[in-house]
Amino acid sequence: MALTLRVLCPDQNVFDGQADEVILPSTTGQLGVLPGHVSLLTALDVGVLRMRDGNQWTAIALMGGFAEVDDDEVSVLVNAAEPASGINAEEAQKQLSEAEQAWSKFDGQPNSPDKIKAQQAFQKARARLQATKAN
């Protein structure tokens, strides 16, 4: 028995298929879902969704949203998502370094809109790079 997984963004259907196991980046930590899981609704953080089909793991970088688990169906609604297969690891590493440098300029400063944007850019860049290493 497998899970039906759907990953949806406002502008595209990123994934619609079967998986034996799904690991979600919830706001309270990693959340593993197997067939027969209890129904739930959870907020998702910026991070990496991992799904297993047999012995093959696949990753998708998620940019925050929500997930619903109900009757062996996992519906993931996110602001943006990018399959690891479409991410260039070298470019992702470069973007992470740039985002980290931009965010570090705000060390010790109180929160401001610019500091929060820099932190979000860092989190997104980190998720993209992690997705490339998750396969």
From Swiss-Prot:
The keyword Transcription does not apply. GO terms for cellular component: plasma membrane-derived thylakoid membrane; proton-transporting ATP synthase complex. Its main location: membrane. It is a peripheral membrane protein. Pfam families: ATP-synt_DE, ATP-synt_DE_N. The keyword Magnesium does not apply. Residues 91-122 are annotated as: Disordered. Keywords: ATP synthesis, CF(1), Hydrogen ion transport, Ion transport, Membrane, Thylakoid, Transport. It comes from the Bacteria. It is found in: Cellular thylakoid membrane. One of its GO terms (molecular function) is proton-transporting ATP synthase activity, rotational mechanism. Produces ATP from ADP in the presence of a proton gradient across the membrane. Belongs to the ATPase epsilon chain family. F-type ATPases have 2 components, CF(1) - the catalytic core - and CF(0) - the membrane proton channel. CF(1) has five subunits: alpha(3), beta(3), gamma(1), delta(1), epsilon(1). CF(0) has three main subunits: a, b and c. This is ATP synthase epsilon chain. It comes from Synechococcus sp. (strain RCC307).
